[in-house]
Every structure is written in C-alpha cells, then in structure tokens.
Amino acid sequence: MSVINMSDLDLAGKRVLIRSDLNVPVKDGKVTSDARIRASLPTIEAALKQGARVMVTSHLGRPTEGEYNEEFSLLPVVNYLKEHLKNPVRLAKDYLEGVDVAEGELVVLENVRFNKGEKKDDETLSKKYAALCDVYVMDAFGTAHRAQASTHGVGKFAPVACAGPLLSAELEALGKALKSPARPMVAVVGGSKVSTKFDVLNSLVKIADTVIVGGGIANTFVAIDNNVGKSLYEPDFVDAARKLRDEFKIPVPTDSRVGTEFSETAPATLKKVSEVNDDEEIMDFGDETALAMAKLLKEAKTILWNGPVGVFEFPNFRKGTEIVARAIADSEAFSIAGGGDTLAAIDLFGIEDKISYISTGGGAFLEFVEGKALPAVVMLEERAKQ
C-alpha cells in the first residue's frame, strides 16, 4: 500500500487543508471527551511548525445536511484548540468561496455536514474544498470507510493529496496486527450482536489462532448447547455460530454472571452456563471463563480487541471485562484496540498507556479487519501513482 505521507512534503507557505476526525461528544458547549482531538493535534502542530497556512475541518454529530445548526457547530472544538495550541485559532463559517489564512494561524472550517452534498461525495462541493488548498491531508481514519466530499472527493481534485501521520499510523498498526501478526494471535470480539460482527468474526477466524467472543455474541455461542434464559442473543445465528465454533478455535464461556433484570442495581449470581434459568440473563463472563481467557491473552504475541465481554457499565457485571482488559494490558503482546465501547472500557480501567495502539476508528476499524477497501485510502493510493 503506497500513499504520499504528509511527512514527505515541504509545507512551508502552502495552504494545507487537514481533514481530521474531531467528532467529539459535546455537552453545554464543552467537549466532554477529548481523545479524538488529542490524537489529531500532532498532525496540526506539525503543519503549523513547518510554516503552512493551516485549515482543519471535520464533521460533528448528525445535523440535517445543508442547514446550519448551532448544536453541531465546531465552536467547542475551536475553544478547546485555543486552550491547547500556542497559535491563534479561529472558526470560519462561510468558506466555500475561499478563506484567508495567515501563516502560523489555524482556521477551523465549520462542520462539513452543514454543506449540501457532503455525504453524497458531490463533485462540485469536492472541487470547492480542493480549491481552498495546495495540499489536502486526509487524517481521519474514523471516516476513511465513507466516500464523502471531505474525505474522498476533495482528494481527487486537490493539487496534492496525502495521508496524515495519524492515518498512516492507524494503517501501519492494523497492517502489523492483521497482515503479518506475531503468533499466537488472539482476537477478542465483544458487543451485543453476532449479526453486526459476523463478517469480522469470519475474517478473524482465518487470521487469528484463537477468537474470544464476549457479550451478546458469546451468548449466541452459549445457546448452541444451553438454555440462555432471557439473555440477549440471536436465535437466527445459532447455526452459523455452531459452524464457526466447530471449524475454528473459539472457546465458549463455561460460567457466567447472571441477573434477573437488566439494571445497574441487579445483583449478580455466578453460575455454570448449563444452569441458567428461564428468568435469568447472562450479563458477564464468570470467573472461570474470564481467567481461562486471561491465560490465552497472557500467552499471545498479537492481540486485537474490539468490544467488551459483559455489561461493564453496570458495576456488578464489570469483572469479566476488567479481567480481560487487565490481561491485555499486562501482556507482552503487540495489542491494538478499537471501537467506542472498547475505548470507554480502556478509559474506565486506566490502561490507555498499556495498549500498544488504540485506534480512533469504529466502523473503519471493523471494515479494515473485514478486509474491505477503505475509499479514502484507495483514493490516496491512486493519487500517489499520478
């Protein structure tokens, strides 16, 4: 995979448009989780340091396309950047016909989804974005799987299109985990539904030596041979789960923590999976299962983690995810983690500095794991050939 990297270019005096992923949660006008902005800062700072005239843009939330809506403005992000950058920062609301940027200044272009045609990868809009810059930098791995005007179209028409350091690092880390992993490789796939992760499971069983399943996905595997009561599982996928279990190395939980209602205060009872009653639901790994999975992780050389193994938001059903998370953190393996709930678990257990690589992408992370081509990356590869 060959793309032009931002680090290969001389940006001095150039107009540089960086497409970052600054889609962060905002409450009462304040950024409540800054992980994505922090991940994007080194790219912005590197361009400013080179003496470029830097513009950065992103989407935020899901506004009605083509309409300005203050609720989805990038202003809270601008205020955050003002606090964390030495350079002057300002927000530009109307920029499609051109914007003046001083050297050493950062101009944040308002939410791209306020522009009609953004999601449809509209060619006219893409050309307007491209006319703003001498160099377009795609640095938003989290949206690399969407062909949109600010992530894909603009790159076709900008004088130069390159990958930013964050995007390059994401692709390198995922490539290391999936293309030539040190073995044994263990994947952890959690979450509520087999149906949404079926393609991921199908890909991973062919790459990994062991795939650990958790959450509602694991319940579907448990349901092959057991009553799962009122647990979240997918009856339609039991046969597919059986086929995967029989063909590949997927250890199925042997015990679990169950509750009689899905609530934060529901008491947890430790049970063998063969003993679950009709009025109970499985909400976490039991100790035996969690420790067995931790042993597999301890022996791993490569770990890919996507999704918690239980309802970790509820303190009574957190232990399984914590044991697995700490096993990954303590492992000497190269570990890569991705997905919103996974990042929340990493945050909760304070193990951020013990994971080798934390991916900023959710959907893009999964599509890459599935082996799908990411439109933004394909575009960058094509531009590199020109």
Curated annotation (Swiss-Prot):
<dbReference type="Pfam" id="PF00162">
    <property type="entry name" value="PGK"/>
</dbReference>
<dbReference type="GO" id="GO:0005524">
    <property type="term" value="F:ATP binding"/>
</dbReference>
<comment type="similarity">
    <text>Belongs to the phosphoglycerate kinase family.</text>
</comment>
<dbReference type="InterPro" id="IPR001576">
    <property type="entry name" value="Phosphoglycerate_kinase"/>
</dbReference>
<feature type="binding site">
    <location>
        <begin position="339"/>
        <end position="342"/>
    </location>
    <ligand>
        <name>ATP</name>
    </ligand>
</feature>
<feature type="binding site">
    <location>
        <begin position="59"/>
        <end position="62"/>
    </location>
    <ligand>
        <name>substrate</name>
    </ligand>
</feature>
<feature type="binding site">
    <location>
        <position position="113"/>
    </location>
    <ligand>
        <name>substrate</name>
    </ligand>
</feature>
<protein>
    <recommendedName>
        <fullName>Phosphoglycerate kinase</fullName>
        <ecNumber>2.7.2.3</ecNumber>
    </recommendedName>
</protein>
<feature type="binding site">
    <location>
        <position position="36"/>
    </location>
    <ligand>
        <name>substrate</name>
    </ligand>
</feature>
<feature type="binding site">
    <location>
        <position position="146"/>
    </location>
    <ligand>
        <name>substrate</name>
    </ligand>
</feature>
<comment type="subunit">
    <text>Monomer.</text>
</comment>
<dbReference type="GO" id="GO:0006094">
    <property type="term" value="P:gluconeogenesis"/>
</dbReference>
<keyword id="KW-0963">Cytoplasm</keyword>
<feature type="binding site">
    <location>
        <position position="197"/>
    </location>
    <ligand>
        <name>ATP</name>
    </ligand>
</feature>
<keyword id="KW-0324">Glycolysis</keyword>
<keyword id="KW-0418">Kinase</keyword>
<keyword id="KW-0067">ATP-binding</keyword>
<comment type="pathway">
    <text>Carbohydrate degradation; glycolysis; pyruvate from D-glyceraldehyde 3-phosphate: step 2/5.</text>
</comment>
<dbReference type="GO" id="GO:0005829">
    <property type="term" value="C:cytosol"/>
</dbReference>
<dbReference type="GO" id="GO:0043531">
    <property type="term" value="F:ADP binding"/>
</dbReference>
<feature type="binding site">
    <location>
        <begin position="21"/>
        <end position="23"/>
    </location>
    <ligand>
        <name>substrate</name>
    </ligand>
</feature>
<dbReference type="InterPro" id="IPR015824">
    <property type="entry name" value="Phosphoglycerate_kinase_N"/>
</dbReference>
<dbReference type="GO" id="GO:0006096">
    <property type="term" value="P:glycolytic process"/>
</dbReference>
<keyword id="KW-0547">Nucleotide-binding</keyword>
<feature type="binding site">
    <location>
        <position position="313"/>
    </location>
    <ligand>
        <name>ATP</name>
    </ligand>
</feature>
<dbReference type="InterPro" id="IPR015911">
    <property type="entry name" value="Phosphoglycerate_kinase_CS"/>
</dbReference>
<dbReference type="GO" id="GO:0004618">
    <property type="term" value="F:phosphoglycerate kinase activity"/>
</dbReference>
<dbReference type="InterPro" id="IPR036043">
    <property type="entry name" value="Phosphoglycerate_kinase_sf"/>
</dbReference>
<keyword id="KW-0808">Transferase</keyword>
